[in-house]
């Protein structure tokens, strides 16, 4: 089912979208400061593509927590709390692939990626919440309202169930954008090695 929001429209991500989800998010992030920090120079684009196939593509499709534009030039994926209406737990094969492959994807950077993830996990809201894992729009499709449209289904789940949304970002531009849809900075952080600035943002549910 396509959700029509005027222009643009968004729909739930499907299995057939996984390659393009990975391609879109890789294009968005390939030269980012985060990618340079998280992934070695050797094979960075291939590593990033595989990461997004697993974490954004297969995880989001299998759990029902991903939305895309019709042409998949923009993507939003979430991690939902256990038992959230309309979602499913990640299949065992997806969990196993993530656990097995993430250290290899990050290569020599895995230690700081893992340690930083632990810091972020400790800072997340204590109770059930929706976690915005990935949000990206290809440069050729920006300034069309895709990002805001893609966030609406996940935020609607939050508002219906009375749960907050949260995320972490590494650029101030992302902070400014998310503030426009109701997120606020909960705390400023940095990666475990001090090399990457991070902001944890939380959006309270709206009645």
List each model region and its residues:
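A short beta-loop-alpha structural element at the N-terminal edge
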Residues: 9-23, 27
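Active-site rim helix/loop that mediates acceptor-substrate recognition in acyltransferases
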Residues: 41-65
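Conserved beta-hairpin
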Residues: 58-78, 136
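Conserved acyl-donor/pantetheine-binding loop and adjacent beta-alpha core of acyl/acetyltransferases
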Residues: 75-136, 142, 192-193
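Conserved GNAT acetyl-CoA-binding A-motif
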Residues: 128-130, 157-170
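Conserved acetyl-CoA-binding loop-helix of GNAT-fold acetyltransferases
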Residues: 137, 143-156, 180
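Conserved active-site alpha-helix within GNAT-family acetyltransferase domains
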Residues: 148, 160-162, 171-188, 194-195
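C-terminal "cap" of GNAT-fold acetyltransferases
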Residues: 168-172, 191-207
């Amino acid at each position: 089912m396509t959700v029509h929001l005027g222009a643009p429209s968004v729909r739930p991500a499907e299995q057939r979208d996984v390659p393009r989800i990975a391609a879109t998010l890789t294009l968005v992030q390939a030269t980012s400061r985060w990618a340079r920090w998280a992934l070695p120079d050797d094979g960075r684009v291939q590593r990033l593509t595989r990461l997004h196939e697993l974490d954004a593509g297969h995880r989001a499709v299998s759990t029902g927590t991903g939305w895309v534009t019709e042409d998949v030039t923009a993507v939003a994926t979430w991690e939902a709390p256990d038992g959230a209406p309309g979602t499913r737990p990640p299949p065992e094969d997806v969990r196993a692939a993530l656990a097995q492959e993430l250290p290899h994807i990050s290569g020599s950077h895995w230690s700081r990626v893992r340690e930083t993830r632990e810091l972020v996990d400790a800072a997340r809201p204590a109770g059930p919440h929706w976690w915005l894992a990935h949000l990206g729009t290809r440069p050729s499709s920006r300034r069309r309202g895709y990002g805001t449209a893609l966030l609406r289904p996940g935020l609607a789940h939050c508002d219906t169930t009375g749960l907050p949304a949260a995320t972490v970002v590494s650029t101030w531009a992302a902070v400014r954008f998310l503030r426009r849809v109701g997120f606020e900075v909960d705390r400023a952080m940095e990666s475990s090695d001090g090399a990457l600035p991070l902001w944890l943002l939380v959006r309270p549910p709206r009645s």
